[in-house]
């Protein structure tokens, strides 16, 4: 069954890409979409019937060279099953949605065949992503990692006639190569120290790696920390974390369904999946985990600030994605890998829905993407408005504080997963991450409601012809939105106990003794007061200190074999347990931030509409700083792009032009004609000239014989 899940999208890609002329373009759409829905249904069957123990499915032998013995296999555990349903569900719905969205694309003429190629690219991406998440060794994972990079390049640059789309595709490809270089170095380092790229061998070797020093770039590093950092650099590139994030907003040049599939729900979460998959290594690398926390927290804050002032509806959601990925990395770095996966799952539902909902708005407004030209659309496209409202309630974290049913808090999906991350950040003792994430939650609420108010409320702005002809999307586009809306509302409550409650150990097949059974409700933690929650004052001081609860290595708890379970939590890791005992003000803080963000968004865009303009004029430097995305693109142009172009130009003009071409052209146009002219003068045609030359030759030959001793 798992093999069918993996290979069905590949079959669809091959048929759609190469066989569409035989089965027609519509036939290719039917085949690719049908195979994706088959893969999706089987993925849910696997997820709901998954046995406790990890399964290893051998497909074929792959690479055998010296100590490297690599097979192609499938690692099936709870982590894999979660990613299977995320990837295949979103991909299947995006395929269905694209039937309507790509039906009449203005970037192509009526006679151009583009749909089969687009659907083939989508299916190929899905196969590469499935190869990544099912891999049983790091080389296979790297091939899937690079496969999604290639598919992303093809899909971002799908409108290859647009220079901006080509530039965005190249930018995404190049920036990701920086992160991939770190990932490759991490794989090589692990193979160098363990003689294996098999995950179970690496996991079993993690305690020894924590005791090993590795010489790298003229310095000595702890091997576990160094290798975990290198792997995380790869995750930073793929998941668009700070410094390697610049490709993600530009990737919105691709078709909107691509944004929903790749840049919201699947490819960008590969980095989070990598950190969670390698949790047995990260648990022995406290400095690397601290780096993950700080990078994630700063990214969440940075992207939220930029999202405050963006005007392109897709770019607002893109920066929202970047920010939410930061939340996931904070959870993973804090050691609560199940919570990171919880937010990954819920985020996939509401972010894919927001992107597809934005696509419905763009479709209604005849491909207008500037929110300043929207307004009053809730009456024109009521179903899309309802969908976008649900997505906004989910991403901003709307719920009922301190109210639960059966131990499950009541709220939209983002309320449960995002609040779990913020509470875990506080419980880990990292005050910096806690306060930064709360601030980011407030800004998330502001820009999300700003999008709603600018798009659906107020008077119509911009081209009145577009407003007059705005219409609801076809049913084939609205049906996927409705299904995603169900997940955006219910996913958090349905799986709360499994990811953050009293079923974590059984759900992820963790030995209870390794970390203590997580207590999923406040009632279950009565009588247990974690150190970080003894008093509100003590908790506040601990948070401000910014010390990590997991800062001490866990090497003393070494195990001789690969740890049991889809994720690994060391015995010293009690963060998920302590998170349920944090003070009430900590639990209320993200809700307060959400309400504050909503209030200011209403004030700026409903209550006092001239206020945004007055604020921008009063703070022009800050406004331009945020509008220009902290000037990261300009900084990278100054430090890397322009020097690289200058060096390339010098090598082209001076190296290729002057040296290589100069040598060849100089030989062809200079020396050869010179010797030709000399030879031409010698060939005079007079007999006595040739006789004189022969005499000179004989004299020279005799002189050489005498000087060298003749025959001796």
Curated annotation (Swiss-Prot):
Annotated keywords: Membrane, NAD, Quinone, Translocase, Transmembrane, Transmembrane helix, Ubiquinone
Q: Where are the transmembrane segments?
A: 4-24, 28-48, 79-99, 113-133, 138-158, 183-203, 216-236, 256-276, 290-310, 325-345, 346-366, 385-405, 421-441, 475-495, 588-608, 655-675, 686-706
Report the catalytic activity: a quinone + NADH + 5 H(+)(in) = a quinol + NAD(+) + 4 H(+)(out)
**Enzyme Commission number(s) from the entry:** 7.1.1.-
Primary enzyme class: translocase
Keyword Protein biosynthesis (UniProt) = no
- Please report the record's description of how this protein sits within the membrane: Multi-pass membrane protein
Without the gene, what phenotype results?
No functional NADH-quinone oxidoreductase complex. Cells lacking this gene have a nearly normal respiratory growth phenotype on lactate, however they are unable to perform anaerobic photosynthesis. It is suggested that in R.capsulatus this complex may function in reverse flow under physiological conditions.
Q: Which Pfam families match?
A: Proton_antipo_M, Proton_antipo_N
Keyword Membrane listed: yes
- Give the record's GO CC terms: plasma membrane-derived chromatophore membrane
MF terms from GO for this chain are: NADH dehydrogenase (ubiquinone) activity; quinone binding
Subcellular localization is given as: Cellular chromatophore membrane
- Family matches, as Gene3D superfamilies: 1.20.5.2700
Sorted alphabetically, the Gene Ontology BP terms of this entry are:
ATP synthesis coupled electron transport; electron transport coupled proton transport
Q: Which NCBIfam families match?
A: NDH_I_L, PRK06590.1
Explain the purpose of this protein. Answer: NDH-1 shuttles electrons from NADH, via FMN and iron-sulfur (Fe-S) centers, to quinones in the respiratory chain. The immediate electron acceptor for the enzyme in this species is believed to be ubiquinone. Couples the redox reaction to proton translocation (for every two electrons transferred, four hydrogen ions are translocated across the cytoplasmic membrane), and thus conserves the redox energy in a proton gradient.
Record's subunit section? NDH-1 is composed of 14 different subunits. Subunits NuoA, H, J, K, L, M, N constitute the membrane sector of the complex.
Q: Its family? A: Belongs to the complex I subunit 5 family.
* Name of the protein: NADH-quinone oxidoreductase subunit L
Q: Which organism does this record belong to?
A: Rhodobacter capsulatus
Taxon lineage: Bacteria, Pseudomonadati, Pseudomonadota, Alphaproteobacteria, Rhodobacterales
* Protein's gene: nuoL
């Amino acid at each position: 069954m798992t093999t069918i899940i993996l290979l069905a999208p590949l079959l669809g890609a091959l048929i759609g890409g190469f066989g569409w002329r035989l089965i027609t373009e519509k036939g290719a759409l039917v085949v690719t979409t049908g195979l994706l829905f088959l893969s999706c249904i089987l993925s849910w069957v696997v997820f709901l019937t998954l046995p406790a123990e990890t399964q290893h499915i051998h497909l074929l032998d792959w690479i055998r060279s010296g100590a490297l013995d690599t097979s192609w296999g499938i690692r099936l555990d709870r982590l894999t099953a979660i990613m299977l349903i995320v990837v295949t569900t979103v991909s299947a719905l995006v395929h269905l949605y694209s039937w309507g969205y790509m039906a009449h694309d203005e970037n192509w003429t009526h006679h151009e065949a583009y749909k089969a190629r687009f659907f083939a690219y989508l299916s190929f991406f899905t196969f590469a992503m499935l190869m990544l998440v099912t891999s049983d060794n790091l080389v296979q994972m790297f091939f899937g990692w690079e496969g999604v990079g290639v598919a992303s390049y093809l899909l971002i640059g799908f409108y290859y006639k647009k220079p901006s789309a080509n530039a965005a595709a190249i930018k995404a490809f190049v920036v990701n190569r920086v992160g991939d270089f770190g990932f490759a170095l991490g794989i090589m380092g692990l193979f160098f120290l363990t003689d294996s790229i098999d995950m179970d061998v690496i996991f079993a070797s993690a305690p020894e790696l924590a005791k090993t020093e590795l010489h790298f770039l003229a310095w000595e590093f702890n091997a576990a920390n160094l290798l975990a950092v290198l792997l995380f650099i790869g995750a930073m590139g793929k998941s668009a974390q700070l410094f390697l994030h610049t490709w993600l907003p530009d990737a919105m040049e691709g078709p909107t369904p691509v944004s929903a599939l790749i840049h919201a729900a699947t490819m960008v979460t590969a980095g989070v999946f990598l950190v969670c998959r390698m949790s047995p290594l990260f648990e022995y690398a406290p400095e690397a985990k601290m780096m993950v926390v700080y990078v994630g927290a700063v990214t969440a804050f940075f992207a939220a600030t930029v999202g405050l002032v963006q005007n392109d509806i897709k770019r607002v959601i893109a920066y929202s994605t970047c920010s939410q990925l930061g939340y996931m990395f904070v959870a993973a770095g804090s050691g609560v890998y199940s919570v990171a996966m919880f937010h990954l799952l819920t985020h996939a539902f509401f972010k894919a829905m927001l992107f597809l909902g934005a696509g419905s708005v763009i479709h209604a407004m005849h491909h207008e993407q500037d929110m300043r030209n929207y307004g009053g659309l809730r009456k024109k496209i009521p179903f899309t408005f309802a969908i976008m409202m649900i997505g906004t309630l989910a991403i901003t974290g709307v719920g009922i504080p301190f109210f639960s049913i059966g131990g499950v808090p009541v709220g939209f999906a983002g309320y449960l997963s995002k609040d779990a991350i913020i509470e875990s950040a506080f419980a880990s003792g990292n005050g910096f991450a806690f306060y930064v994430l709360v601030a980011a939650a407030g800004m998330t609420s502001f820009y999300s409601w700003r999008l709603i108010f600018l798009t659906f409320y107020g008077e119509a702005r911009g081209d009145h012809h577009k407003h007059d002809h705005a219409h609801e999307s076809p049913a084939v586009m609205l049906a996927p939105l409705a299904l995603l809306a169900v997940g955006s509302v219910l996913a958090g409550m349905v799986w709360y106990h499994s990811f953050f409650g009293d079923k974590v150990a059984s759900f992820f097949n963790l030995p209870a003794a390794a970390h203590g059974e997580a207590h999923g409700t406040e009632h279950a933690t009565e009588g247990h007061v974690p150190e970080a929650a003894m008093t509100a004052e003590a908790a506040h001081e601990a948070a401000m200190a910014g010390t990590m609860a997991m800062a001490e290595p866990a090497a003393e708890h070494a195990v001789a074999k690969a740890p049991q379970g889809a994720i690994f939590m060391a015995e010293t890791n009690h963060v998920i347990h302590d998170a349920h005992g944090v003070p009430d003000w900590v639990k209320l803080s993200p809700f307060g931030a959400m309400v504050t963000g909503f209030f200011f968004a209403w004030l700026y865009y409903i209550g006092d509409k001239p206020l945004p303009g007055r604020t921008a004029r009063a703070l022009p430097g800050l406004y331009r700083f945020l509008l220009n995305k902290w000037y990261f693109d300009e900084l990278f142009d100054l430090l890397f792009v322009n020097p690289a172009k200058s060096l390339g130009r010098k090598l082209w003009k001076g190296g290729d032009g002057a040296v290589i071409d100069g040598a060849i052209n100089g030989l062809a146009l200079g020396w050869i004609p010179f010797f030709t002219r000399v030879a031409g003068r010698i060939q005079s045609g007079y007999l006595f000239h040739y006789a004189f030359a022969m005499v000179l030759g004989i004299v020279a030959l005799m002189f050489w014989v005498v000087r060298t001793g003749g025959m001796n």
